[in-house]
């Protein structure tokens, strides 16, 4: 399906932007799940890489469109349902160099998910499992630790730099916040 030349390329610093879902129809279309902040941004970053049988392959996006609640894609060389089914659940990866550089204080959502959230007093609030966009600011969805002293399962913290968010350390995957652990 892929030429040798395509397979030779591999992302230097791979970043997962989404995942391919189930096949759609008989002509090789696939559903796609995007984890970029604005779902359609995933199409701005090309080329895409996927890993099959431990090998990196570059895939070419031929076309994409909205279908009901989903976005569906057509990849070059994937022309029937069987070929599409082989790609179901493949992660869509790009090289970090393809992403725009961030300004100081901006973070990619994907970098924040998985971080431990600790208050300035040292209380562990749990782990970021998701991000939500609200009108005014982004919100961290923090899953509390199993034996949370306050019996809280999940906390929603506004991502307000300086006000709530005191420090983000991606190296240690820690976010320090000024937050009352009772909430």
From Swiss-Prot:
The keyword rRNA processing applies. GO terms for molecular function: ribosome binding. SUPFAM superfamilies: PRC-barrel domain, Translation proteins. The keyword Chaperone applies. Residues 104-183 form the PRC barrel domain. It comes from the Bacteria. It is found in: Cytoplasm. Its main location: cytoplasm. GO terms for biological process: ribosomal small subunit biogenesis; rRNA processing. Keywords: Chaperone, Cytoplasm, Ribosome biogenesis, rRNA processing. GO terms for cellular component: cytoplasm; ribosome. HAMAP family: Ribosome_mat_RimM. The PRC barrel domain binds ribosomal protein uS19. An accessory protein needed during the final step in the assembly of 30S ribosomal subunit, possibly for assembly of the head region. Essential for efficient processing of 16S rRNA. May be needed both before and after RbfA during the maturation of 16S rRNA. It has affinity for free ribosomal 30S subunits but not for 70S ribosomes. Belongs to the RimM family. Binds ribosomal protein uS19. PANTHER family: RIBOSOME MATURATION FACTOR RIMM. This is Ribosome maturation factor RimM. It comes from Cronobacter sakazakii (strain ATCC BAA-894). The gene is rimM.
């Amino acid at each position: 399906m892929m030429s040798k030349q395509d397979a030779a390329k591999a992302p230097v610093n791979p970043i997962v932007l989404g995942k391919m879902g189930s096949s759609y129809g008989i002509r090789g279309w696939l559903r796609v799940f995007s984890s970029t902040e604005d779902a359609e941004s995933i199409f701005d970053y090309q080329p895409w890489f996927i890993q099959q049988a431990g090998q990196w392959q570059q895939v070419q996006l031929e076309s994409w469109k909205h279908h009901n609640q989903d976005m569906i894609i057509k990849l070059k060389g994937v022309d029937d349902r069987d070929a599409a089914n082989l790609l179901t659940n493949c992660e869509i990866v790009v090289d970090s160099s393809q992403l725009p550089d961030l300004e100081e204080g901006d973070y990619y959502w994907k970098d924040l998910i998985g971080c431990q959230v600790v208050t300035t007093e040292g209380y562990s609030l749990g782990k970021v499992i998701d991000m939500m966009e609200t009108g005014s600011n982004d919100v961290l969805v923090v899953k509390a630790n199993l034996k949370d002293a306050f019996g809280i399962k999940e906390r929603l913290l506004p991502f307000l730099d300086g006000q709530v968010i005191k420090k983000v350390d991606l190296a240690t995957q820690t976010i320090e916040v000024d937050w009352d652990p009772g909430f």
